UniProtKB/Swiss-Prot annotation:
Its cofactor is FAD. Belongs to the GMC oxidoreductase family. This is Uncharacterized GMC-type oxidoreductase y4nJ. The active site is at H431. GO terms for molecular function: flavin adenine dinucleotide binding; oxidoreductase activity, acting on CH-OH group of donors. Its EC number is 1.1.-.-. Keywords: FAD, Flavoprotein, Oxidoreductase, Plasmid.
Length: 505
């Protein structure tokens, strides 16, 4: 390959374009730019973890590929744990690779509300198609395992719509290590698909390189200032000059970087997530979820506002989930083969914020749920409990500290149309969006309809930050679709700019 994952000690670099972040957004931008013949430098804060060296142990895998080792949370009542990838390939290395498009009605709603140009479902369809082709979005052949059957049987018994989920995969072996980096390269993450392709075209990727700031001069992003950690653990200062700059560091670190660079207008003020409540279902017969793929069906009857699905299950991950209330839940560890882990997620009305802190790498993240979000969480938890009992569960234990669990279907009505207890409820999310909403509604949007940061001619955002609101589905396909679209628009914008400059000369 012409590019590479290796570190480099050069201090002064120049390129046609620099991309900050190597996840779904950054890799998609790189694919467009390198195909157009541009010389691209990509900067990634995390390291490269090849499939061949991916650890099967949760503690090692989290430390290698997850930001903060998986221990990150948004401040609020309650704090909400969230997950981000921090490695070459970003979140695509640790997610479930589920491939879904955002609802067409929702896309139209965003187009009108934020005044986003050329944003109809038909106009976005080509980009979604490109994303799906890239990752080979497909149904998983063969038996899917009892965890999947449980969710399907429960939903169908209640007369709900249940959908089998497409995933980005080729010849999945069912290792059940999606969250730990796929050990055989079957999951079609960015490190398997687009990044090698872009590097073959000459892209240079610097791993373990944290970007500190972007220097803005005369309305342009002039220099990207970063620090690379070399093989000996020493820091090396790096400065990159490029005609085009793309920030693709995710919905948390993109706004943090922009604000550190002096760009604050409507940036980092509108964080959206998918608040998620989990429940453990205990059955009389072994589920052996650790031997199966994560559940590959979802209850889609109530989408896009609410969705019910299943989680990756290993003994270690299950133990971590019980640790939130070990006094009352620890005994379930002895029955772990009889257990399955499921969740309900919602599209919230509440919003959060992202603020960088002086001298600290991690920004301050906060999120406040709206009152109606608590009602919605109570509803989706009720639905989840109903589905588990309909599938034959003996007991369902919601992720609420001190809760004794339900032992029959009648008990799950406890929170029907009622708010969950704020202090005791344990929430999490793996989906983060909307900190740089796009559009021509200048009072609401941080970037224009094509991802360009207002007031900076050559600076673009192309990651989950530009999904206008929570989409109610796994976001990878939407991130990739928008990144393809933004990269194409940036090339067109750059061509027009060069032509205008030549005309002036």
């Amino acid at each position: 390959m012409k590019g590479g994952f290796s570190l480099n000690s050069e201090l002064q670099l120049e390129a046609d374009a620099v991309i900050i972040g190597s996840g779904a957004g950054g890799a998609s931008v790189a694919d467009v730019l390198t195909a157009a013949g541009l010389y691209v430098i990509m900067l990634e804060e995390g390291g490269h973890v090849p499939s061949s060296s991916a650890s099967p142990f949760a503690s090692e895998a989290f430390a290698a590929a997850w930001r903060g080792g998986g221990l990150t949370a948004a401040i609020g009542r309650p704090p909400i744990a969230y997950a981000e990838g921090r490695c070459v390939g970003g979140g695509t290395e640790i997610n479930s690779a589920i491939a879904q498009r955002a609802d067409s009605d929702l896309l139209d709603q965003w187009r009108k509300l934020y005044k986003i140009e050329n944003f109809t479902p038909d106009e976005l369809s080509q980009y979604y198609g490109r994303a799906e082709t890239t990752v080979n979005a497909s149904l998983t052949p063969g038996p899917l395992g009892r965890p999947t059957d449980i969710l399907r049987l429960g939903g169908e018994a209640l007369g709900w719509k249940v959908s089998e989920l497409k995933r980005g995969q080729r010849d999945c072996k069912g290792a059940n290590r999606c969250s730990f980096i796929c050990p055989n390269g079957a999951k079609q993450s960015m490190a398997v698909t687009l990044l090698p392709k872009s590097m073959d075209r000459g892209m240079r990727l610097l791993a373990r390189t944290r970007v500190d700031k972007i220097r803005i001069e005369k309305g342009r992003a002039a220099v990207v200032v970063a620090q690379l950690q070399d093989a000996g653990g020493q820091g090396v200062h790096v400065r990159v000059k490029a005609g085009l700059v793309f920030v693709c560091a995710g919905a948390i670190h993109t706004p943090a970087l922009l604000r550190r660079s002096g760009l604050r207008k409507r940036i980092g003020d509108t964080l959206r997530i998918h608040p998620t409540i989990r429940a453990t279902a205990l059955f009389d017969e072994p589920v052996d979820a650790h031997q199966s793929r994560l559940p590959l069906t979802a209850v889609t009857e109530f989408m896009p506002e609410q969705r019910i699905g299943g989680s990756v299950f290993t003994p270690a991950v299950f133990g971590l989930s019980l640790a939130e209330d070990w006094t009352n839940r620890g005994d379930l560890m002895q029955a772990w083969r009889l257990c399955g882990s499921y969740y309900g997620m919602i599209r919230p009305r509440g919003v959060g914020s992202v603020r960088p802190l002086p001298g600290i790498n991690e920004p301050l993240v906060s999120f406040k749920l709206a009152p109606e979000d608590w009602i919605s969480l109570g509803q989706v938890l009720t639905l989840l409990g109903q589905a588990m009992f309909a599938a034959g569960a003996r007991k369902v234990i919601p992720s609420i500290s001190g809760h004794e669990g339900w032992t029959n279907p009648d008990e799950v009505d406890e929170f029907r149309n009622k708010p969950l207890p704020e202090k005791a409820t344990n929430l999490m999310t793996i989906h983060l969006f909307s900190t740089c909403p796009p559009g021509e509604h200048r009072d609401a949007c941080a970037v224009d309809s094509y991802g360009r940061v207002r007031g900076v001619e050559n600076l673009f955002v192309a990651d989950g930050s530009v999904i206008p609101e929570a989409p109610g589905v796994n976001p990878q396909m939407t991130i990739m679709a928008l990144a393809f679209r933004i990269a194409e628009a940036a090339l067109s914008h750059s061509s027009r700019e060069r032509a205008q400059s030549a005309a002036r000369e």
